[in-house]
Regions:
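Accessory cap/linker subdomain of secreted extracellular hydrolases
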Residues: 71-74, 80, 144-259
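A catalytic-pocket lid/entrance helix-loop region that shapes and gates access to the active site
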Residues: 130, 134-205, 271, 290-335
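Loop/turn elements at helix/coil->beta-strand transitions in domains of secreted/extracellular proteins
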Residues: 42-45, 81-84, 123-126, 148-152, ...
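Cap/lid segment of the alpha/beta-hydrolase catalytic domain
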Residues: 36-119, 166-169, 174, 308-321
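Extended, hydrophobic alpha-helical segments in both membrane/secreted and soluble proteins
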Residues: 74, 90, 109-114, 127-129, ...
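Alpha/beta-hydrolase-fold serine-hydrolase catalytic core, especially in secreted/extracellular enzymes
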Residues: 2-13, 17-23, 148, 231-249, ...
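A short loop-to-beta-strand scaffold at the N-terminal edge of the catalytic core in hydrolase folds
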Residues: 21-37
């Protein structure tokens, strides 16, 4: 398989973009090598808003056989094809100011970020978004406000249709992955990174042991040393009935489908992911009464593991991988999407299927050399 082309790029690092409340978010702008803002023709833009560090490794990206690629390298792939690429730290994360409250600031902050991009000399007024998991949530949150310039989206494994039913709770039952996520990310928070005592307190906790010491309460949890993370976690945990708190922007896209612009959207997830219901509900909701294409991909993977051909003890075979089966590679799939919808490139000769689903089963059932069952499967399309 040919490796994606990666070329040098120009960087406008650590642009501090002001939000409506005055908080500034750290933003990196990647431009094609030699590009002259204000002199050369403006460019279509690709945006990813992330809580995981705008210049850090993206664990699911793959280039030249390397799994886990720094975001600047991902940006260089797209800038080499004539796009501007923007990576931004979410509020309260890494270089951004403000207090992190999971999910609920992403709509207004995303809207304000697109408004800022639209004012820049390197932007031609057409913006696409991308991202996995939380970076899919940030996309859906901003789309619910119909922001200026939003022209297409690629959501991978996220973008809450209804956080009470899927993603934060499952049909009302609280997902304890929210607690493990909060603990892990609290250790990377500005509070912990700037205060060795806070970091030491977090690292001294045994998160597994804490799960044997239920119930937790404020001040008596592994997050007690970082109140902003403890507070939002308990707000989610206590909200055990579906009320107005679950209809908030950022965790309830199904209440905003009519507000989301009629633009091309690609939705991808996997049968063993936490966001199956979210992805299917968003597909159903966004295909009603719209002219723009909405495309669905459902693989047999775990969360973000689009080129891993097994899940647990089930082996699905080489056809299960995204790369080489649905497209040459995931970067190339997104490039073709953005060229089509941000640059009006001609569509391919073959019609783009509305849905591509991996149908599991049909294997021999025998164990392979790794001890997994040959479950098999094949891609089908509609």
């Amino acid at each position: 398989m040919t490796a994606p082309e990666v070329s040098p790029a120009a960087l406008l690092a650590d642009q501090m973009v002001r939000m409506r409340d005055g908080v500034r978010l750290a933003t990196d702008v990647h431009l094609p090598a030699g590009y002259r803002p204000g002199l050369d023709a403006p460019l279509p833009v690709i945006l990813e808003r992330t809580p995981y560090g705008k210049a850090e490794v993206s664990r699911s990206e793959q280039i030249d056989g390397r799994l886990g690629v720094p975001r600047p390298e991902v940006a260089r792939y797209f800038t080499a094809h004539g796009f501007a690429v923007v990576f931004q730290d979410c509020r309260g994360r890494y270089g951004s100011e403000g207090q992190f409250t999971k999910y609920l600031s992403e709509g207004p902050d995303g809207f304000d970020t697109l408004a800022w991009i639209m004012q820049q000399p390197w932007c031609n007024g057409r913006i696409g978004t991308m991202g996995l998991s939380y970076a899919a949530h940030t996309q859906m949150a901003l789309a619910c406000l119909n922001p200026p310039g939003l022209a297409c989206m690629v959501l991978d494994s996220g973008g809450f249709s209804n956080g009470y039913q899927c993603g934060i709770r499952q049909s009302g039952a609280f997902e304890l992955k929210q607690a493990t996520w909060a603990y892990k990310q609290a250790k990377l928070s500005p509070a912990a990174q700037q205060d060795p005592l806070v970091l030491a307190a977090l690292e001294a906790e045994d998160i597994r042991q804490w799960f044997t010491r239920m119930p937790w309460r404020p001040g008596h949890s592994p997050l007690a040393s970082v109140p902003e993370y403890e507070n939002y976690l308990f707000e989610q945990w206590r909200a055990d009935t579906f009320d107005e708190s679950w209809r908030q922007l950022g965790i309830y896209a199904e209440g905003y489908y009519d507000a989301i612009p009629d633009i091309p959207v690609a939705l991808m997830s996997s049968w063993y992911d936490a966001y199956v219901r979210t992805t299917l509900e968003n597909y159903a909701g966004l295909t009603q009464g719209r002219q723009s294409p909405v495309r669905l991909i459902m693989g047999p993977w775990l969360h973000g593991d689009r080129n891993t051909t097994h899940s647990g003890d089930a082996e699905f075979g080489p056809r299960a991988a995204f790369d080489g089966n649905l497209a040459q590679h995931w970067l190339g799939f997104r490039l073709a999407w953005y060229q089509r919808w941000l640059r009006d490139a001609p569509a391919g000769a073959a019609p783009d299927p509305a849905a591509r689903l991996f149908l599991m089963g049909g294997g021999s059932g025998a164990r392979d050399a790794q001890g997994r069952f040959d479950h098999g499967g094949a891609w089908i399309q509609a």
